[in-house]
Swiss-Prot record:
Disulfide bonds: none annotated. The keyword Protein biosynthesis does not apply. The active site is at residue 19. NCBIfam families: PRK00299.1. CDD domains: SirA. It comes from Serratia proteamaculans (strain 568). GO terms for biological process: tRNA wobble position uridine thiolation. InterPro entries: Sulphur_carrier_TusA, TusA-like, TusA-like_sf. This is Sulfur carrier protein TusA. Interacts with IscS.
Length: 81
């Protein structure tokens, strides 16, 4: 089985940051990425379980995978739909 998270083009460590900082950092990072590139986000703020999927829907990015059973949480975002 392939670990999708290991194949990310970029990684964003948001450990220790609290809302709204993780989403602000994701937005800033994604802005400098090319369409189709992937970003691994690692966070421990429980609010990211709601905020990251919401950000992806609102900004029309694809949430490829997420692991949110226990912290640290991992999200794999692909820029663009």
């Amino acid at each position: 089985m392939t670990d999708l998270f290991a194949q990310a083009d970029q990684t964003l460590d948001a450990l220790g940051l609290r809302c709204p900082e993780p989403v602000m950092m994701v937005r800033k990072t994604v802005r400098h990425m090319d369409n189709g590139e992937t970003l691994l986000i690692i966070a421990d703020d429980p609010a990211t379980t709601r905020d990251i999927p919401g950000f992806c829907r609102f900004m029309e990015h694809t949430l490829v995978a997420q692991e949110t059973d226990t912290a640290p949480y991992r999200y794999l975002l692909r820029k663009g739909v």
